[in-house]
Amino acid sequence: MIIEVCSQNRALKEVTNIQTGELVSVISIVSSDEKGVEFDCKENLCGVLHLKFNDLEKEYDEEGIPYGRPLPKSKDLNGLKEFVVQLDCDRLIVHCYEGTSRSAAAASAIWKFRGGSDTILTHQRFAPNRLAYILACKELGITPGNQPVPTVR
């Protein structure tokens, strides 16, 4: 399976252009105060998991000023394991707004959970949000590691 990490805009385009015969699933990650992304229902779209959590790793910035938004919590990733265990597709699109940190964190945890045999396709910088990665690993029942995730551009 290919795990594709991308931005929200690219995910919408990719789902619109699913090739005939290709089976695709999506994990859609938005901030906690945003409306979820709607994907046009296509017969090749196997499923969509909607997750909502902010792209934060700590509560305060370097000067001690609070960000004013809640940190991701374990409950924000509820349903991830059930969704991943049931995957039966050629490609899993994992997106967040920019496609670099929350989606990279989820994709890294999924890659590790599935034994590291999938290909991770990226379109830009790959910088997993560390807190989101730890929470995703916890939801998947695996131990987070510092193992680098091989990516393909």
Task: Provide a role label for each language-model segment.
Residues 1-40:
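Cys-based phosphatase fold recognition centered on the PTP superfamily
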Residues 81, 85-114, 118:
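Catalytic cysteine-centered active loop of the rhodanese-like fold, especially the PTP/DSP P-loop
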Residues 21-23, 46, 89-91:
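A general structural motif
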Residues 25-27, 47-51:
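Hydrophobic/aromatic beta-strand patches that form the interior of the parallel beta-sheet core
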Residues 42-44:
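Short, conserved loop/helix-junction motifs that constitute active-site signature segments
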Residues 49-93:
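Helix-loop module immediately N-terminal to the HCX5R catalytic loop
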Residues 35-36, 59, 101-105:
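Short catalytic/ligand-binding loop motif for oxyanion handling, primarily in non-cytosolic enzymes
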Residues 108, 113-153:
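Cysteine-dependent PTP/DSP-like catalytic domain, specifically the C-terminal lobe
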